[in-house]
Regions:
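N-terminal pre-domain and mature-chain start segments
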Residues: 1-119, 129-166
Length: 166
């Protein structure tokens, strides 16, 4: 089992490691402290004090607020909803549903036919960062990516108690 320092984990998160080191870190069995070090690196990158419980994306986290409630929160501090809800329904949504809008991101002949596929861009209402993009058919409902079982992840995978929740 490989052991890594807090600095190495920080460099991994920031993309400052060479590919061979990254490959080794990803493929080798993880040391027991790795997830806690990872959370510390993420916590140091945000300006809010709420404890990060689980990252959902580069700028999206499940956090424990001061009342011990778990909330989905953007890296800027904007709170969306409980982790059981679909946070996307609380985001600003920009839909690329015309040829003109698609051609802003793809050349004309490479863009999707918007009768068959649209892009939905989910944006934080406070800071404007792009949090996710979907490419469904136009009539398809907003996709709820997943609902993490945080308690099981902590207890069965990490072997530790999850943060308190009310």
């Amino acid at each position: 089992m490989s052991k890594y320092t807090q600095e190495q984990i920080k460099n991994l998160v920031e993309g400052n490691l060479d590919w061979n080191t990254v490959l080794k870190m990803l493929s080798m069995p993880k040391d027991h402290e790795r997830f806690q070090m990872y959370l510390k690196v993420l916590q140091d990158k945000v300006d809010f004090d709420d404890k990060i419980v689980l990252p959902l994306g580069p700028h999206l986290f499940v956090v424990q607020d001061p009342q011990k409630k778990w909330v989905v929160k953007c890296s800027c501090g904007h709170a969306f909803c409980a982790p059981e809800e679909n946070w996307k329904l609380h985001a600003n949504i920009y839909v690329r549903d015309t040829a003109e809008k698609m051609e802003e991101v793809y050349p004309k002949l490479l863009a999707s036919d918007t009768n068959w596929q649209v892009y939905r861009e989910y944006i934080c209402p406070d800071c404007g960062i792009l949090l996710d993009v979907e490419a469904p058919t136009p009539w398809y409902p907003v996709i709820h990516d997943f609902e993490p079982d945080i308690e099981t992840f902590y207890k069965d995978w990490l072997g530790i108690q999850p943060p308190e929740r009310h």
